[in-house]
UniProtKB/Swiss-Prot annotation:
This is Histidinol dehydrogenase. Gene3D superfamilies: 1.20.5.1300, Nitrogenase molybdenum iron protein domain (3.40.50.1980). CDD domains: Histidinol_dh. It catalyses: L-histidinol + 2 NAD(+) + H2O = L-histidine + 2 NADH + 3 H(+). Its cofactor is Zn(2+). Pfam families: Histidinol_dh. One of its GO terms (biological process) is L-histidine biosynthetic process. The gene is hisD. One of its GO terms (cellular component) is cytoplasm.
Amino acid sequence: MEEILRLRRSVSIDDYIEKVKPIVEAVKREGDKAVIRFTRDLDGVELDSLRVTEDEFEKAYDAVDDGLIDALEVAKENIYRFHYVTSVERDMKVEFEDCVMGKIYTPIEKVGAYIPGGRASYPSTALMIGVPAKIAGVEKLVACTPPNKDGKVNPLTLVALDIAEFDEVYKAGGAQAIAAMAYGTETVEKVYKIVGPGNIYVTAAKLLVAKDVAIDMPAGPSEILVIADETANADFIACDCLAQLEHDPMAVAVVLTTSRKVADEVEKKVKSEGDFSNFAVFVVEDLAEAFEISNEFAPEHLTVAVKNPEEWLGKVRNAGSVFLGNFSPVAAGDYASGTNHVLPTAGYAKIYGGLSVESFLKHFTFQMLSEESMRRIGGDVVKIAEAEGLRWHAESVRKRLEKI
Protein backbone atom coordinates (compact mmCIF):
# COMPACT_ATOMS: atom_id res chain seq x y z
CA MET A 1 0.00 0.00 0.00
CA GLU A 2 2.81 2.41 0.82
CA GLU A 3 4.25 1.86 -2.65
CA ILE A 4 0.93 2.84 -4.22
CA LEU A 5 0.48 5.91 -2.03
CA ARG A 6 3.98 7.10 -2.95
CA LEU A 7 2.84 7.47 -6.57
CA ARG A 8 1.14 10.65 -5.43
CA ARG A 9 4.02 13.08 -5.31
CA SER A 10 4.15 14.96 -2.06
CA VAL A 11 3.82 18.70 -2.54
CA SER A 12 3.73 21.16 0.33
CA ILE A 13 0.65 23.24 -0.34
CA ASP A 14 1.74 25.62 2.43
CA ASP A 15 4.72 26.67 0.30
CA TYR A 16 2.42 27.58 -2.57
CA ILE A 17 0.01 29.42 -0.29
CA GLU A 18 2.92 31.65 0.73
CA LYS A 19 3.77 32.21 -2.95
CA VAL A 20 0.25 33.29 -3.90
CA LYS A 21 -0.39 35.39 -0.79
CA PRO A 22 1.19 38.59 -2.24
CA ILE A 23 -0.89 38.16 -5.40
CA VAL A 24 -4.12 37.73 -3.47
CA GLU A 25 -3.38 40.69 -1.20
CA ALA A 26 -2.52 42.93 -4.15
CA VAL A 27 -5.76 42.08 -5.96
CA LYS A 28 -7.67 42.70 -2.75
CA ARG A 29 -6.10 46.19 -2.52
CA GLU A 30 -5.85 47.26 -6.15
CA GLY A 31 -8.62 45.42 -7.98
CA ASP A 32 -8.53 45.33 -11.79
CA LYS A 33 -5.15 47.02 -11.93
CA ALA A 34 -3.49 44.17 -10.05
CA VAL A 35 -5.25 41.46 -12.06
CA ILE A 36 -4.11 43.05 -15.33
CA ARG A 37 -0.57 43.52 -14.00
CA PHE A 38 -0.18 39.90 -12.86
CA THR A 39 -1.68 38.65 -16.11
CA ARG A 40 1.04 40.59 -17.92
CA ASP A 41 3.91 39.68 -15.59
CA LEU A 42 3.06 36.02 -14.95
CA ASP A 43 1.26 34.97 -18.13
CA GLY A 44 2.81 37.33 -20.66
CA VAL A 45 -0.58 38.62 -21.78
CA GLU A 46 -1.46 42.29 -22.22
CA LEU A 47 -5.10 43.09 -21.44
CA ASP A 48 -7.07 46.31 -21.82
CA SER A 49 -10.09 44.99 -19.95
CA LEU A 50 -11.20 41.84 -18.15
CA ARG A 51 -14.82 41.27 -19.15
CA VAL A 52 -15.55 39.18 -22.24
CA THR A 53 -17.83 41.20 -24.54
CA GLU A 54 -20.90 40.14 -26.52
CA ASP A 55 -18.90 40.68 -29.70
CA GLU A 56 -16.28 38.19 -28.50
CA PHE A 57 -18.99 35.60 -27.84
CA GLU A 58 -20.44 36.12 -31.32
CA LYS A 59 -17.03 35.72 -32.96
CA ALA A 60 -16.42 32.58 -30.89
CA TYR A 61 -19.51 30.93 -32.38
CA ASP A 62 -18.27 31.81 -35.86
CA ALA A 63 -14.93 30.15 -35.10
CA VAL A 64 -16.29 26.85 -33.78
CA ASP A 65 -17.49 24.00 -35.99
CA ASP A 66 -21.27 23.46 -35.91
CA GLY A 67 -20.80 19.76 -35.25
CA LEU A 68 -18.77 20.54 -32.15
CA ILE A 69 -21.42 22.96 -30.93
CA ASP A 70 -24.01 20.21 -31.40
CA ALA A 71 -21.82 17.84 -29.36
CA LEU A 72 -21.67 20.36 -26.52
CA GLU A 73 -25.46 20.68 -26.62
CA VAL A 74 -25.83 16.89 -26.35
CA ALA A 75 -23.41 16.84 -23.42
CA LYS A 76 -25.35 19.64 -21.72
CA GLU A 77 -28.62 17.75 -22.14
CA ASN A 78 -27.18 14.60 -20.56
CA ILE A 79 -25.54 16.51 -17.72
CA TYR A 80 -28.81 18.33 -17.08
CA ARG A 81 -30.85 15.14 -17.06
CA PHE A 82 -28.60 13.34 -14.57
CA HIS A 83 -28.17 16.28 -12.22
CA TYR A 84 -31.84 17.24 -12.27
CA VAL A 85 -33.09 13.74 -11.51
CA THR A 86 -30.55 13.11 -8.74
CA SER A 87 -30.82 16.48 -7.00
CA VAL A 88 -32.05 16.69 -3.42
CA GLU A 89 -35.67 17.39 -2.50
CA ARG A 90 -35.77 21.14 -1.81
CA ASP A 91 -38.58 21.36 0.74
CA MET A 92 -38.86 18.64 3.39
CA LYS A 93 -41.38 18.78 6.22
CA VAL A 94 -42.12 16.27 8.98
CA GLU A 95 -44.49 16.28 11.94
CA PHE A 96 -43.84 14.60 15.28
CA GLU A 97 -46.52 14.82 17.97
CA ASP A 98 -47.75 18.34 17.11
CA CYS A 99 -44.22 19.60 16.36
CA VAL A 100 -43.73 20.59 12.73
CA MET A 101 -40.12 20.63 11.52
CA GLY A 102 -38.39 20.75 8.21
CA LYS A 103 -35.40 21.52 6.06
CA ILE A 104 -35.43 23.92 3.12
CA TYR A 105 -32.67 24.21 0.52
CA THR A 106 -31.99 27.54 -1.16
CA PRO A 107 -29.43 28.43 -3.83
CA ILE A 108 -26.18 30.23 -3.13
CA GLU A 109 -26.86 33.57 -4.80
CA LYS A 110 -23.45 34.31 -6.36
CA VAL A 111 -20.96 31.68 -7.53
CA GLY A 112 -17.66 32.01 -9.36
CA ALA A 113 -16.19 29.25 -11.51
CA TYR A 114 -12.58 28.74 -12.47
CA ILE A 115 -12.31 27.24 -15.96
CA PRO A 116 -8.73 26.02 -16.53
CA GLY A 117 -6.53 26.88 -19.48
CA GLY A 118 -2.81 26.38 -19.83
CA ARG A 119 -1.91 22.93 -21.19
CA ALA A 120 -5.34 22.62 -22.82
CA SER A 121 -8.73 24.29 -22.94
CA TYR A 122 -11.54 22.67 -20.99
CA PRO A 123 -14.94 23.69 -22.38
CA SER A 124 -16.45 20.61 -20.74
CA THR A 125 -15.69 22.06 -17.30
CA ALA A 126 -17.95 25.01 -18.13
CA LEU A 127 -20.83 22.58 -18.65
CA MET A 128 -19.99 20.54 -15.55
CA ILE A 129 -20.20 23.66 -13.39
CA GLY A 130 -22.80 25.74 -15.16
CA VAL A 131 -25.51 23.12 -15.60
CA PRO A 132 -25.88 22.04 -11.95
CA ALA A 133 -25.47 25.64 -10.79
CA LYS A 134 -28.41 26.75 -12.90
CA ILE A 135 -30.51 23.77 -11.79
CA ALA A 136 -29.80 24.87 -8.23
CA GLY A 137 -31.02 28.37 -9.08
CA VAL A 138 -27.80 30.38 -8.72
CA GLU A 139 -28.73 33.96 -9.59
CA LYS A 140 -25.30 35.24 -10.60
CA LEU A 141 -22.89 32.75 -12.15
CA VAL A 142 -19.55 34.12 -13.32
CA ALA A 143 -16.37 32.54 -14.62
CA CYS A 144 -12.69 33.35 -14.85
CA THR A 145 -10.60 31.63 -17.48
CA PRO A 146 -7.04 32.37 -18.66
CA PRO A 147 -6.67 34.31 -21.92
CA ASN A 148 -4.43 33.20 -24.76
CA LYS A 149 -1.26 35.10 -25.63
CA ASP A 150 -3.31 37.36 -27.90
CA GLY A 151 -5.52 38.35 -24.97
CA LYS A 152 -8.53 36.34 -26.07
CA VAL A 153 -10.30 33.34 -24.54
CA ASN A 154 -10.34 30.07 -26.48
CA PRO A 155 -13.46 30.25 -28.73
CA LEU A 156 -14.63 26.75 -27.80
CA THR A 157 -14.46 27.61 -24.11
CA LEU A 158 -16.51 30.76 -24.72
CA VAL A 159 -19.15 28.83 -26.63
CA ALA A 160 -19.37 26.28 -23.82
CA LEU A 161 -19.68 29.04 -21.21
CA ASP A 162 -22.52 30.56 -23.21
CA ILE A 163 -24.28 27.21 -23.64
CA ALA A 164 -23.92 26.65 -19.89
CA GLU A 165 -25.64 30.03 -19.31
CA PHE A 166 -22.91 31.85 -17.40
CA ASP A 167 -23.88 35.44 -16.72
CA GLU A 168 -20.42 37.00 -17.05
CA VAL A 169 -16.98 35.78 -18.09
CA TYR A 170 -13.64 37.38 -17.22
CA LYS A 171 -10.24 37.00 -18.85
CA ALA A 172 -8.10 36.05 -15.87
CA GLY A 173 -6.28 32.97 -14.66
CA GLY A 174 -4.21 31.77 -11.74
CA ALA A 175 -4.25 33.14 -8.21
CA GLN A 176 -5.24 36.60 -9.42
CA ALA A 177 -8.50 35.20 -10.83
CA ILE A 178 -9.38 33.46 -7.58
CA ALA A 179 -8.65 36.62 -5.59
CA ALA A 180 -10.74 38.72 -7.96
CA MET A 181 -13.79 36.50 -7.49
CA ALA A 182 -13.24 36.19 -3.74
CA TYR A 183 -12.98 39.92 -3.03
CA GLY A 184 -14.39 41.59 -6.13
CA THR A 185 -12.83 44.27 -8.32
CA GLU A 186 -14.18 47.16 -10.36
CA THR A 187 -15.10 44.60 -13.04
CA VAL A 188 -15.23 41.17 -11.42
CA GLU A 189 -18.25 40.26 -9.32
CA LYS A 190 -17.57 39.30 -5.70
CA VAL A 191 -19.03 35.83 -5.14
CA TYR A 192 -19.99 33.70 -2.14
CA LYS A 193 -18.48 30.45 -3.40
CA ILE A 194 -15.71 29.50 -5.84
CA VAL A 195 -15.68 26.16 -7.64
CA GLY A 196 -13.65 24.49 -10.35
CA PRO A 197 -10.29 22.77 -10.82
CA GLY A 198 -6.94 24.40 -11.47
CA ASN A 199 -3.21 24.01 -11.02
CA ILE A 200 -1.35 24.09 -7.72
CA TYR A 201 -1.36 27.91 -7.64
CA VAL A 202 -5.12 28.02 -8.16
CA THR A 203 -5.63 25.42 -5.44
CA ALA A 204 -3.38 27.35 -3.06
CA ALA A 205 -5.28 30.57 -3.75
CA LYS A 206 -8.62 28.85 -3.15
CA LEU A 207 -7.40 27.53 0.19
CA LEU A 208 -6.08 30.98 1.11
CA VAL A 209 -9.37 32.77 0.41
CA ALA A 210 -11.47 29.99 1.98
CA LYS A 211 -11.64 31.99 5.20
CA ASP A 212 -13.70 34.59 3.31
CA VAL A 213 -15.61 32.57 0.70
CA ALA A 214 -16.71 28.96 0.39
CA ILE A 215 -14.84 26.65 -1.99
CA ASP A 216 -15.81 23.30 -3.45
CA MET A 217 -12.79 21.17 -2.55
CA PRO A 218 -9.00 21.11 -2.79
CA ALA A 219 -7.91 19.79 -6.18
CA GLY A 220 -4.76 18.01 -7.25
CA PRO A 221 -3.47 16.20 -10.35
CA SER A 222 -5.81 13.82 -12.18
CA GLU A 223 -5.77 10.15 -11.21
CA ILE A 224 -7.30 6.78 -11.98
CA LEU A 225 -7.29 3.44 -10.21
CA VAL A 226 -8.41 0.39 -12.17
CA ILE A 227 -9.56 -2.88 -10.62
CA ALA A 228 -9.50 -5.65 -13.22
CA ASP A 229 -9.92 -9.40 -13.46
CA GLU A 230 -9.26 -11.80 -16.33
CA THR A 231 -12.35 -10.57 -18.21
CA ALA A 232 -10.95 -7.04 -18.57
CA ASN A 233 -9.83 -5.64 -21.91
CA ALA A 234 -6.18 -4.67 -21.42
CA ASP A 235 -6.19 -2.27 -24.36
CA PHE A 236 -9.18 -0.39 -22.92
CA ILE A 237 -7.49 -0.14 -19.53
CA ALA A 238 -4.22 1.11 -21.01
CA CYS A 239 -6.06 3.83 -22.93
CA ASP A 240 -7.92 4.90 -19.78
CA CYS A 241 -4.63 5.15 -17.90
CA LEU A 242 -3.01 7.15 -20.68
CA ALA A 243 -6.04 9.44 -20.79
CA GLN A 244 -5.36 10.49 -17.21
CA LEU A 245 -1.59 10.62 -17.58
CA GLU A 246 -1.86 13.06 -20.50
CA HIS A 247 -3.48 15.65 -18.22
CA ASP A 248 -0.44 16.49 -16.13
CA PRO A 249 3.13 15.26 -15.43
CA MET A 250 1.97 14.60 -11.86
CA ALA A 251 -1.15 12.63 -12.86
CA VAL A 252 -1.41 9.12 -11.40
CA ALA A 253 -2.59 5.81 -12.90
CA VAL A 254 -2.73 2.57 -10.89
CA VAL A 255 -3.94 -0.86 -12.00
CA LEU A 256 -4.82 -3.62 -9.53
CA THR A 257 -5.55 -6.92 -11.24
CA THR A 258 -5.93 -10.58 -10.39
CA SER A 259 -4.63 -11.51 -13.85
CA ARG A 260 -0.91 -11.60 -14.66
CA LYS A 261 -1.80 -11.62 -18.38
CA VAL A 262 -3.84 -8.42 -18.08
CA ALA A 263 -1.10 -6.82 -15.97
CA ASP A 264 1.61 -7.55 -18.54
CA GLU A 265 -0.47 -6.35 -21.49
CA VAL A 266 -1.50 -3.09 -19.82
CA GLU A 267 2.04 -2.35 -18.69
CA LYS A 268 3.45 -3.01 -22.16
CA LYS A 269 0.91 -0.76 -23.87
CA VAL A 270 1.29 2.18 -21.47
CA LYS A 271 5.08 2.04 -21.40
CA SER A 272 5.18 1.99 -25.19
CA GLU A 273 3.69 5.49 -25.09
CA GLY A 274 6.21 7.00 -22.68
CA ASP A 275 8.02 6.78 -19.39
CA PHE A 276 5.45 7.59 -16.71
CA SER A 277 6.87 7.66 -13.21
CA ASN A 278 3.38 7.84 -11.65
CA PHE A 279 2.05 4.71 -13.36
CA ALA A 280 2.14 1.24 -11.83
CA VAL A 281 0.50 -2.17 -12.18
CA PHE A 282 0.10 -4.59 -9.27
CA VAL A 283 -1.12 -8.18 -9.25
CA VAL A 284 -3.32 -8.84 -6.21
CA GLU A 285 -4.54 -12.05 -4.59
CA ASP A 286 -8.24 -11.38 -5.11
CA LEU A 287 -10.75 -8.62 -5.78
CA ALA A 288 -11.49 -8.15 -2.09
CA GLU A 289 -7.86 -7.08 -1.59
CA ALA A 290 -8.10 -4.74 -4.58
CA PHE A 291 -11.14 -2.95 -3.16
CA GLU A 292 -9.49 -2.67 0.24
CA ILE A 293 -6.48 -0.97 -1.35
CA SER A 294 -8.71 1.24 -3.51
CA ASN A 295 -10.73 2.46 -0.53
CA GLU A 296 -7.53 3.47 1.22
CA PHE A 297 -6.21 5.20 -1.91
CA ALA A 298 -9.60 6.92 -2.49
CA PRO A 299 -9.10 7.63 -6.21
CA GLU A 300 -10.63 10.42 -8.22
CA HIS A 301 -11.70 7.91 -10.88
CA LEU A 302 -12.26 4.22 -10.11
CA THR A 303 -12.74 1.79 -12.98
CA VAL A 304 -14.14 -1.64 -12.10
CA ALA A 305 -13.43 -3.87 -15.11
CA VAL A 306 -14.53 -7.24 -13.72
CA LYS A 307 -17.21 -9.87 -14.32
CA ASN A 308 -20.56 -8.65 -12.97
CA PRO A 309 -19.16 -5.26 -11.88
CA GLU A 310 -22.40 -4.02 -10.31
CA GLU A 311 -22.14 -6.76 -7.70
CA TRP A 312 -18.96 -5.11 -6.43
CA LEU A 313 -20.32 -1.56 -6.23
CA GLY A 314 -21.25 -2.07 -2.59
CA LYS A 315 -17.57 -2.60 -1.78
CA VAL A 316 -16.72 0.97 -2.81
CA ARG A 317 -16.49 3.42 0.09
CA ASN A 318 -14.12 6.10 -1.20
CA ALA A 319 -14.04 7.28 -4.83
CA GLY A 320 -14.86 10.41 -6.79
CA SER A 321 -16.68 8.62 -9.61
CA VAL A 322 -16.94 4.93 -10.48
CA PHE A 323 -16.91 3.43 -13.98
CA LEU A 324 -18.35 -0.08 -14.17
CA GLY A 325 -17.53 -2.61 -16.88
CA ASN A 326 -15.46 -2.66 -20.03
CA PHE A 327 -17.53 -0.07 -21.90
CA SER A 328 -17.54 2.74 -19.33
CA PRO A 329 -14.43 4.81 -20.06
CA VAL A 330 -13.60 7.73 -17.79
CA ALA A 331 -13.71 9.93 -20.89
CA ALA A 332 -17.47 9.32 -21.15
CA GLY A 333 -17.95 10.79 -17.69
CA ASP A 334 -15.48 13.55 -18.48
CA TYR A 335 -17.66 14.78 -21.31
CA ALA A 336 -21.12 13.50 -21.99
CA SER A 337 -22.56 10.58 -20.00
CA GLY A 338 -24.05 13.05 -17.54
CA THR A 339 -22.13 12.61 -14.29
CA ASN A 340 -19.78 15.36 -13.14
CA HIS A 341 -16.05 15.46 -13.77
CA VAL A 342 -15.18 17.99 -11.06
CA LEU A 343 -14.08 15.41 -8.51
CA PRO A 344 -11.96 15.10 -5.35
CA THR A 345 -8.35 14.01 -5.90
CA ALA A 346 -5.31 13.22 -3.75
CA GLY A 347 -7.31 11.03 -1.38
CA TYR A 348 -9.91 13.70 -0.64
CA ALA A 349 -12.64 11.31 -1.82
CA LYS A 350 -12.57 10.08 1.78
CA ILE A 351 -14.22 13.32 2.88
CA TYR A 352 -15.57 15.03 -0.26
CA GLY A 353 -17.95 14.11 -3.05
CA GLY A 354 -17.88 15.41 -6.60
CA LEU A 355 -19.59 18.59 -7.76
CA SER A 356 -23.39 18.33 -7.83
CA VAL A 357 -26.52 20.45 -7.58
CA GLU A 358 -26.11 20.30 -3.80
CA SER A 359 -22.73 22.04 -4.17
CA PHE A 360 -24.68 25.18 -5.07
CA LEU A 361 -27.29 24.89 -2.33
CA LYS A 362 -27.40 25.62 1.36
CA HIS A 363 -30.16 24.76 3.79
CA PHE A 364 -31.91 26.02 6.86
CA THR A 365 -34.16 24.13 9.25
CA PHE A 366 -37.41 25.30 10.80
CA GLN A 367 -39.69 24.21 13.60
CA MET A 368 -43.10 25.22 14.92
CA LEU A 369 -44.07 23.86 18.33
CA SER A 370 -47.62 23.70 19.63
CA GLU A 371 -48.50 24.23 23.29
CA GLU A 372 -48.74 20.46 23.63
CA SER A 373 -45.24 20.06 22.15
CA MET A 374 -43.90 22.66 24.56
CA ARG A 375 -45.56 20.90 27.49
CA ARG A 376 -44.08 17.58 26.38
CA ILE A 377 -40.40 18.61 26.04
CA GLY A 378 -40.24 21.85 28.04
CA GLY A 379 -39.27 20.25 31.34
CA ASP A 380 -36.41 18.36 29.72
CA VAL A 381 -35.17 21.52 28.02
CA VAL A 382 -35.12 23.35 31.36
CA LYS A 383 -33.15 20.55 33.02
CA ILE A 384 -30.49 20.47 30.30
CA ALA A 385 -30.21 24.29 30.13
CA GLU A 386 -29.74 24.53 33.89
CA ALA A 387 -27.16 21.74 33.81
CA GLU A 388 -25.19 23.81 31.28
CA GLY A 389 -25.49 26.89 33.48
CA LEU A 390 -27.52 28.86 30.94
CA ARG A 391 -30.11 30.59 33.09
CA TRP A 392 -31.97 32.50 30.40
CA HIS A 393 -32.21 29.48 28.11
CA ALA A 394 -34.08 27.75 30.92
CA GLU A 395 -36.13 30.84 31.76
CA SER A 396 -37.26 31.33 28.15
CA VAL A 397 -38.88 27.90 28.30
CA ARG A 398 -40.14 28.14 31.88
CA LYS A 399 -42.04 31.37 31.07
CA ARG A 400 -43.87 29.62 28.27
CA LEU A 401 -44.71 26.62 30.40
CA GLU A 402 -46.30 28.97 32.93
CA LYS A 403 -48.67 30.26 30.24
CA ILE A 404 -49.81 26.82 29.11
